[in-house]
From Swiss-Prot:
GO terms for cellular component: plasma membrane. It comes from Haemophilus influenzae (strain ATCC 51907 / DSM 11121 / KW20 / Rd). Disulfide bonds: none annotated. Its EC number is 1.6.5.9. Alternative, nonproton pumping NADH:quinone oxidoreductase that delivers electrons to the respiratory chain by oxidation of NADH and reduction of quinones. Utilizes NADH exclusively, and electron flow from NADH to ubiquinone does not generate an electrochemical gradient. GO terms for molecular function: NADH dehydrogenase (ubiquinone) activity; NADH:ubiquinone reductase (non-electrogenic) activity. This is Type II NADH:quinone oxidoreductase. InterPro entries: FAD/NAD-bd_sf (IPR036188), FAD/NAD-binding_dom (IPR023753), NADH-Q_oxidoreductase (IPR051169). It is a peripheral membrane protein. It holds the Pfam family Pyr_redox_2. The gene is ndh. Binds 1 FAD per subunit. Its cofactor is FAD.
Length: 444
């Protein structure tokens, strides 16, 4: 029996493992193994909702082991550290517990076909101080860290206001501005914009849960973008509409502003200016992990992505595929396939078909990315975007309730790929029930 190993359980990796398990694993044509450093899967485009407490990671995450049991693939927890192409195995680092004790030793996982789907991480562009003084939103662990710090900040702010009321200012805790909670977000892409909107919405809800007289006026978000406009993937008119919406919420948007250094509670701009904040998030650009440099001579580009052919096979080794954000595939227009969830979803389907073809001794097919458009959610305020128009050259502009429905449907499509029609219907029902049974925000 052949071994098919998928490294990375993100949007593309877990969908691919599900497709392969349901066919090759079920029919015992291959042993399908999924490898990930975490025990659970969470759809990365929704990490900003985990960060603000809108989404509960405990409810919305998916156990790899449980999902594998239901879809005929096995799961190995661990981080890949290298590939041996000659002997055809991947080496995984040991797994350690919270107390630092080793739970699982280093292992070698043999493969006949290997798929790398390790995604991407925030690109700090080697900016001084960013790693030490900023929070990234690349994982649920980082999103939860942000959420805990956010709740602590609002608790401090609420307590300071209460001390003002009773005249005991000497006990107040220090914030960069005693009149507001200040948060700086670097990066005017989808993550930065959506996080900004969710923060203002969360601030409005906190007063309902015992945080005192807090509303969105108590929050100041500074959104910093090095380019000339927000959301460059959107048409200019929609980018301008997003800018207007954020400003109406109270956001301080700084365009054409490059950050050269991050210090504790301070960002330094290229012109020498300072941006003070109680909490700083870095969401500017992405790159693949440097671990790809240890992949036994596979071709990588300047941001560590694995260069692949149109069949999604790596240029050096036909038995190794790469999909999602970690794959560099040049399209016919000369541009790389963008690092988006919809690209990972399409690549997972195409890769599964090509692996099926290998088992059936059939020719592999070329992958062609179909850009279906871009959607951005501004929390409960609105949503907008542009969708590909099959009947004309100009994209369709969508806004409001239809755009919100389309945005939510992207996540439902991912869930459908994992669970099928019946289970996704039950999941939607449970989600609706949870709106009535649970608080709007996760407060712990």
């Amino acid at each position: 029996m052949k071994n098919v190993v998928i490294v990375g359980g993100g949007a593309g990796g877990i969908e691919l493992a599900t497709f392969l398990g349901n066919k090759l694993g079920r029919q015992k044509q291959a042993k399908v193994t999924l490898v990930d450093r975490n025990a659970t899967h969470l759809w990365k485009p929704l990490l900003h909702e985990i960060a603000t407490g809108v989404m509960d990671d405990g409810v919305d995450s998916l156990s790899y082991r449980a999902h594998g049991k239901n879809h005929f693939f096995s799961f190995e927890q661990g981080s890949i550290i290298r590939i041996n192409r000659e002997q055809k195995y991947v080496e995984l680092a040991p797994v350690y517990g919270q107390e630092g004790d080793m739970l699982v030793i280093a292992r070698r996982i043999p493969y006949d076909y290997l798929v790398i789907a390790i995604g991407s991480k925030s690109n700090d562009f080697n900016t001084k101080g960013v790693a030490d003084n900023c929070i990234f939103l690349d994982s649920s662990k980082q999103a939860l860290r942000f959420q805990h710090k956010l709740l602590e900040l609002f608790l401090k702010f609420s307590e300071n206001r209460a001390l003002d009321d009773i005249g005991e200012e000497e006990f107040k805790q220090k914030l960069v501005d005693e009149n507001k909670v200040n948060i700086a977000i670097v990066g005017g892409g989808a993550t930065g914009v959506e996080l900004t909107a969710e923060l203002y919405h969360a601030a409005e809800d906190l007063s309902s849960y015992g945080y005192g007289k807090i509303d969105s006026s108590c929050l100041q978000v500074t959104l910093v973008e090095a380019g000339t406009r927000l959301l460059p993937a959107l048409p200019e008119n929609l980018s301008a509409a997003v800018l207007d919406e954020l400003k109406e919420m109270g956001t301080n948007v700084q365009l054409n502003t490059m950050i050269t250094e991050a210090q504790p509670n301070t960002l330094i701009t290229k012109d020498g200016g300072e941006i003070k904040a109680d909490l700083i998030v870095w969401a500017a650009g992405v790159r693949a992990s440097t671990v790809t440099q240890q992949f036994d001579g596979l071709e990588i580009n300047r941001i560590n992505q694995l260069v692949v052919k149109d069949t999604l096979q790596t240029t050096v080794d036909d038995s190794i595929f790469a999909i999602g954000d970690c794959a560099a595939l040049i399209q016919s227009n000369g541009k790389l396939v963008p690092p988006r969830a919809q690209a990972a979803h399409q690549m997972a389907k195409a890769c599964a078909k090509n692996i099926f073809a290998l088992f059936e001794n059939k020719p592999l097919k070329s992958f062609k990315y179909n850009d279906k458009g871009t959607l951005v959610s501004l929390s409960n305020f609105t949503a907008l975007g542009s969708l590909t128009n099959k009947f004309g050259k100009n994209p369709l502009t969508v806004q409001g309730k239809f755009a919100q429905f389309a945005y939510v449907s992207l996540y439902r499509m991912h869930q459908h790929a994992l669970h099928g029609c019946i289970k996704i219907g039950l999941i939607i029902l449970v989600d609706k029930l949870n709106r009535y049974l649970k608080p709007r925000l996760k407060l712990h």
